[in-house]
Design a protein with these regions (language model features):
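Soluble acyl-CoA-dependent acyltransferase catalytic core bearing the H(X)4D motif
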Residues: 1-228, 232-295
Length: 295
């Protein structure tokens, strides 16, 4: 850090000492919540390990109207419903691999926006992350959704997401010990502390056109890295919610099970409100004509 940057940080702090004290407090609370994640997961999982150069990609679909109906019927948020469906997908994937799910959770990194209310509508990216635990042990879909909603509400008030963004903003003024701890958290988080990544990107809810042609659907892709063998991205567009699942081809050629599990998770939550929801076998038939892509 240059002397100029240090002076600028001190000047900013001098102009708003109460704000700096408040931000340091927010960082401290957030880092306290990070501490439990520094311990590696006690359960070995096929979701983690060395990854090769090739990928398999597959997808799942849902309707935003169905997700909103589930939210209206059972409570929670759209994001809670999406995470509940993904949880069911991972549950089915693990069971299909013969791995136990009793007493088990899947830790996932969830990127979130940390814009303040006043910053909404701005174009700069202010993104941090929360660490959620997907309760794959819960078989009942409504209980699963309730558990996720309670957890996400707690995480939103825990300061996890605020911590990383505040540390960047404080720059050269935060105590050296706090910055050192934040650096270790941000760059040395053990890969075994997380099992997967789930990123939700809201898209436009009106149709888009190019050269007079309407874009019918858009599917996201999430890259893999470290020891994470499977990642899930979610993109909503024009009344639809599409899931893109990336897997390491060598270790996870079966991510189609995860995709079907995601669709089943939506159908399970929707069925009390819409008993005529398509069955798993009905949805599986067209998928057999659309094999997943290996790269």
């Amino acid at each position: 850090m240059s002397p100029y940057e240090a002076a600028r940080g001190l000047l900013s702090a001098a102009r708003g000492p109460r704000r700096v004290i408040r931000q340091v407090a927010e960082v401290s609370r957030g880092l306290a919540n990070f501490s439990s994640l520094l311990n590696p997961s006690t359960t070995a999982s096929s979701l983690n390990g060395p990854i090769g150069p090739h990928r398999r990609w597959d997808w799942a679909r849902a309707r935003l109207g169905d997700v909103k109906q589930i939210r209206k019927t059972h409570g929670g948020t759209v994001n809670d419903v999406v995470l509940a469906a993904i949880t069911n997908g991972f549950r089915e994937l693990l069971l299909s691999r013969g791995e136990p799910v009793a007493g088990r959770v899947i830790r996932t990194l969830v990127p979130v926006s940390v814009r303040s209310h006043e910053e909404r509508g701005s174009y700069d990216n202010k993104v941090s992350a929360m660490f959620a635990e997907l309760p794959v042990e819960i078989e009942d879909p409504v209980r699963r959704l309730d558990a996720l909603h309670e957890q996400m509400q707690h995480l939103k008030h825990s300061g996890q997401a605020v911590a990383a963004e505040r540390l960047t903003a404080l720059g050269g003024f935060a105590p050296a010990m706090l910055l050192a701890l934040a650096g270790r958290v941000g760059t040395r988080l053990p890969q075994s502390a997380i099992n997967t990544v789930t990123t939700n990107v809201p898209g436009p809810q009106q149709p888009l056109y190019l050269a007079g042609k309407r874009m019918l659907e858009a599917f996201p892709f999430v890259p893999l890295g470290g020891q994470v063998r499977v990642g899930v991205a979610i993109f909503s567009y024009d009344g639809g919610i599409n899931f893109g699942v990336t897997g390491d081809l060598d270790s996870s050629p079966d991510i189609g099970v995860l995709c079907r599990g995601i669709e089943d998770g939506i159908a399970q939550l929707l069925s009390p409100a819409a008993p005529s929801a398509p069955t798993r076998s009905e949805r599986a038939k067209p998928r057999s004509r659309r094999p997943s892509r290996a790269t």
